[in-house]
Amino acid sequence: METQRASLCLGRWSLWLLLLALVVPSASAQALSYREAVLRAVDRLNEQSSEANLYRLLELDQPPKADEDPGTPKPVSFTVKETVCPRPTRQPPELCDFKENGRVKQCVGTVTLDQIKDPLDITCNEVQGVRGGRLCYCRGWICFCVGRG
């Protein structure tokens, strides 16, 4: 009788531990990776664009230092390039080829890794040219160059 009671108690604890194990990963699964957050920003850029073709991620700058809070805005910098896919097709940009001589845009701003909050603040400017193998864009009198070179 005593062993039945102990077995029943152990079974309850096992059940609680199993439920806890199922709940904890699902809570952390709501956090995006830095790359996923940027890809979501590219999707938003394509949704809000009035241009004929979709843009696809071309280059992603280094992520900022790790921050434990997925809701804290993270600085982001990336480059997108025009693809051959027309915007109305709603095809995932990752499946589209880059357009030869397509437009290139440098994007900067902030993203969050929280799937629920999702505030984005991204500004993209068309790259003005190539200097020594690096993409350059200008805002007023100031030019920024990114990439290798």
From Swiss-Prot:
The keyword Signal applies. Belongs to the cathelicidin family. Disulfide bonds join C85-C96, C107-C124, C136-C145, C138-C143. GO terms for molecular function: lipopolysaccharide binding. GO terms for cellular component: extracellular space. One of its GO terms (biological process) is defense response to Gram-negative bacterium. Residues 30-130 form a propeptide. The modification Arginine amide is found at R148. Microbicidal activity. Keywords: Amidation, Antibiotic, Antimicrobial, Disulfide bond, Secreted, Signal. This is Protegrin-4. Residues 61-80 are annotated as: Disordered. It is found in: Secreted. Its main location: secreted.
